[in-house]
Amino acid sequence: MARPEQPVDIEHLNRYTGGDGGLNEEILQLFATQCREMMDRLESLASGDADAKSWRETTHTLKGAARGIGAFALGNAAAEAEKAGGARPAVLPALEQLKTTSAAVYLFIEQFLKDRR
């Protein structure tokens, strides 16, 4: 039976870290912090007149960071949000998808770090 896709592909991350567990932990902690900051920024942008340039820059940064650690579903959601271009109401469903996907990533990272202790 195939294992469901995980929010973060640790094997992908391992290819970049040489399987260094300590480095994986550091990268995942840093990503979680930065992701929360970017999500806060996107929520702020979506709650008012979203600045299209800031929306695209933030979603683009999130897309690259997520894909870099192996959080491909989050990276794909960020790519879709980037296409929304910052215009309301188009950003609202994109933001909801980002919230759902990022929450799964946060939980995965939290459990991964807990299991390593």
Task: Write out the residue ranges for each language-model feature.
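An anion-binding catalytic pocket shared by soluble metabolic enzymes
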Residues: 62
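Short, charged, low-complexity loops and linkers
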Residues: 12-26, 57
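Alpha-solenoid HEAT/Armadillo repeat architecture
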Residues: 17-18, 47, 67, 83-86
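Helix-loop segments that flank and shape redox-cofactor active sites
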Residues: 37-54
